[in-house]
């Protein structure tokens, strides 16, 4: 079975849309998680808050589309059906990767660290709170399940 990259990208985009919605829902309930904001402040001056959020949200959704394509390409190459059970495993691996990268990328981020407006997250966001590693993993598992469920549904009807 050949991967359909357009459907994979759309599925990843929708998965990232759901992930972003859940991030801001958690933020509304007092959790200090705002991954799109971290992405935005990497490229836009922190004083331009509306521009930060606009660019960050768009970039986060495009990154999600890229991850959707990567999921489908790798699963198809492994001759595994891209469906929701595979989404659980790939989402977990994705969450581990993102959690590790947050700590590494923070070292070069212009607004993260001591004497900067954003506190350093540490590996898996541990420095942002006790629940943060669980949120990062859980949200990316949800992303994987949503992305691959949409892809599988779209192809099989």
Regions found by a protein language model. Give the residues of each.
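Juxtamembrane/disordered regions of integral membrane proteins
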Residues: 1-157
């Amino acid at each position: 079975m050949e991967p359909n990259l357009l459907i994979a990208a759309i599925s990843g985009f929708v998965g990232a849309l759901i992930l972003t919605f859940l991030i801001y829902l958690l933020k509304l309930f007092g959790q200090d998680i705002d991954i799109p904001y971290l992405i935005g402040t990497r490229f836009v001056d922190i004083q331009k808050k509306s521009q930060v959020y606009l660019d960050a949200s768009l970039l986060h959704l495009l990154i999600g589309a890229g991850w959707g394509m990567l999921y489908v390409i790798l699963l198809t190459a492994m001759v595994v059906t891209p469906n929701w059970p595979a989404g659980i495993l790939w989402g977990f691996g994705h969450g581990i990767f993102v959690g590790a990268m947050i700590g590494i990328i923070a070292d070069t981020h212009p607004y993260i660290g001591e004497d900067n407006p954003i506190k350093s997250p540490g590996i898996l966001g541990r420095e942002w709170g006790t629940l943060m590693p669980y949120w990062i993993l859980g949200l990316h598992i949800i992303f994987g399940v949503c992305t691959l469920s949409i892809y599988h549904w779209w192809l099989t009807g």
